[in-house]
Amino acid sequence: MSDFIGTKLTMNLGERSYDIILKNGALENLYQFARLDRKVAVVTDSGVPAEYAQRVADQCRESTIITVPQGEASKSFKILETVLRQMLEFNMGRGDLVVAVGGGVVGDLAGFAAAIYMRGIDFINCPTTTLSMIDSSIGGKTAVDLGDTKNIVGAFWQPKLVIVDPATLSTLPRRHYINGLAEAVKAGLLADPELFAIFEKGDIDT
């Protein structure tokens, strides 16, 4: 990877350490950063352009795409069971991989499925929204809702890798793009004056 032009950050968590790759076009070059010579379940939702999941699947030796309905309602036991059944029907084993391609709902659902399938298999998160890139894809928190109670059933299951491809933001509705930047504003207020200064200038597309 001598020609890699991007940013790599490492979350130092001992045995559960993982890298965060920030690079335009990283999604279609996932094979450069991850082992895809195994069965891969690519989990996405109906609101994410289908081409993103397909780009990942096309790089894998053996893959299946699992598409769930868009929205918070997909963080349910019913949808979780659907994902797990499709993984089982795909004959996934302990050495196989789940890749989430989408926003926070997809990351939470796919990550939790990976955490509990066969007591835990590898998981890669590829966030496609500003909020999930900045916040929910990092930290290893995975969960589903129970009735009206959000994120009450879950697990801490760190991904093996997080791929942040800013090119995917080109298809994100403008209001979702701006709403997700609230987490970046908060980070700037707490720890990064230079970042906060960018928001003060109103230059949010830099």
Task: List the model feature ranges, each with a label.
Residues 112-205:
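A glycine/threonine-rich phosphate-anchoring loop and its flanking beta-alpha core
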Residues 104:
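Acidic-aromatic/histidine active-site loop/patch
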Residues 56, 110-113:
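Hydrophobic residues within alpha-helices
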Residues 91-101, 150-156:
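Short, basic, helix/turn surface patches
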Residues 2-97, 186:
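ATP/NTP phosphate-donor binding region
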Residues 107:
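Catalytic nucleophile loop
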